[in-house]
């Protein structure tokens, strides 16, 4: 079972998503995208696989967003991708790729939609929120 996560270890949502993947018994390929950003083609493929607009992958609460005036609706998709490649911190995360699909996992529970294997046991997020019970079932 091949799973890849575009991960930022400084992000709680990314850490929780990685932990949910591991709670399913899988050990994913981890791409630290701030250190090793995707290529232009890879980024385009990820966006297409998620079926989201380019702008939906753009982080807004980081300094380059304001400095580059990215809130303005004057940039093409290609220009937005250029900005994300020049400033990988602008790429929202975590992105997870599995045989069942590709998702921007915000919130982290989105990963459950595409994991090939069920959860193996209880899971509690870093903030204390119970997500999975002892039987491996989603807590509503």
Give residue ranges: language-model regions.
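Non-globular targeting/processing and membrane-anchoring segments
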Residues: 1-2, 85-92, 97-140
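Thioredoxin-like thiol-disulfide oxidoreductase module
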Residues: 65, 73-88
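Glycine-rich loops and low-complexity Gly/Arg-rich segments
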Residues: 29-31, 52-57, 81-83, 120-123, ...
